[in-house]
UniProtKB/Swiss-Prot annotation:
SMART domains: MR_MLE (SM00922). Has no detectable activity with D-mannonate and with a panel of 70 other acid sugars (in vitro), in spite of the conservation of the residues that are expected to be important for catalytic activity and cofactor binding. May have evolved a divergent function. Belongs to the mandelate racemase/muconate lactonizing enzyme family. GalD subfamily. This is D-galactonate dehydratase family member SSBG_02010. It comes from Streptomyces sp. (strain SPB074). It comes from the Bacteria. GO terms for molecular function: magnesium ion binding. GO terms for biological process: amino acid catabolic process. The keyword Repeat does not apply. D-arabinonate binds at residues 248, 298, 319, 348, 375. Coiled coil: none annotated. Mg(2+) binds at residues 246, 272, 298.
Amino acid sequence: MASSAHSDSASSDAPAELPAEILAAAPWSAPADDSEHLRITAVRTFLTAPQGCPYVIVRVETNQPGLYGLGCASDPQRTLAIRSVVDDYYAPMLLGRDPADIEDLHRLLFNSGYWRGGSIGQNALAGVDVALWDIKGKVAGLPLHQLLGGRAREAAEAYTHVDGDNAGEIAEKVLAAHERGYRHVRVQVSVPGTDTYGTAPRDAAEARRRELRAGSWDSLAYLRHVPPVLREIRERVGTGVELLHDAHERLTPSQARELVHEVEDARLFFLEDALAPEDAAHFDQLRAAGSVPLAVGELYHDVMMYLPLLQRQVIDFARIRVPTLGGLTPTRKLVAAVELFGARTAPHGPGDVSPVGMAANLGLDLSSPAFGVQEAATFREPTREVFPGTPVPERGRFHGSDRPGLGVDFDEVAARKYPVPEPLRHDRWALLRNGDGSVQRP
């Protein structure tokens, strides 16, 4: 585990002078005298897949022995490109710089490409940015939530996922999750004859079709089938547990309005991604269609994409994804805006967000008055082996770590046991088709 503080004394923990080759490779404005200051000496990326999904982990190292920071830059669809951005573009600009200057370094990297933004650059930037916050916490001897203002709550409520073919099966799973302590449960319903998002395949043949994304989608079948099932689930489980549902941006604006109207009686905690980012202009009409709380944002790659929706008060939950938004530096500002406009946060946290990314989420969750609910991934034993300190919910809540920084470490040796799949598939979200053969949003 990295040291939690640094000293200016001559002890073994004192920052060492940077090697000449580091200074030679450092950018034009990096200070030449590093003997008394903490400096970045290396930026390294690691690819690992302990759960099958590729993680991109960034480690920012310093001239203080044992002091480093970790960041999550994971986007399973653009893994190699993100690694290249960090290694080939960002790392050379960071050598020799002070890791404490997080705001300045974020602006430096963000503006370095001239054509700014986009998922690849933002995820790469997030890996560096979160690692710098991790270093800052270790130097200060404080956990992330304390750096962000301190605890606003004892623990962060989490939601888990269940799915099934019918209301009886799903309701039984919801009640079982409630017995385990979860007060919020996302429910996904299999639609016969379609490749339904968020549901388990029924057999090996369907699993193979899903792997190849060779299935088809039928929005009208979804609209006929899902609302009655959601209403029946609510009748079966009562009002003691909150229900969530994800439409996963597969509907047109008019279909989304119909869905909002039809699920009113299911009394959802929120309806997620009823509209794709490209259709965000239709949120006013969606809001007018009913009183169902609306959640959106996991696909947004710029915090400014949220601002018009917050200003018009047409969304209730911001589904922030820290890696895709460029890290904690911009996301903490978004969280403040969410609070000011009376909405709540519901950070994205499925299996494609590493334990490092989940720890970043929890820093925001525990410190923000605007927090609503945290999506909870199930991190299996191989993942916990690679990431000592992996956040794990207890009775449906994340209590967070009081260790300095993120509170999560990375075992490089263990990570090598779980290489990313080869060859990597980058087209799986583009292979779903409508009945007429046209490409369907994922």
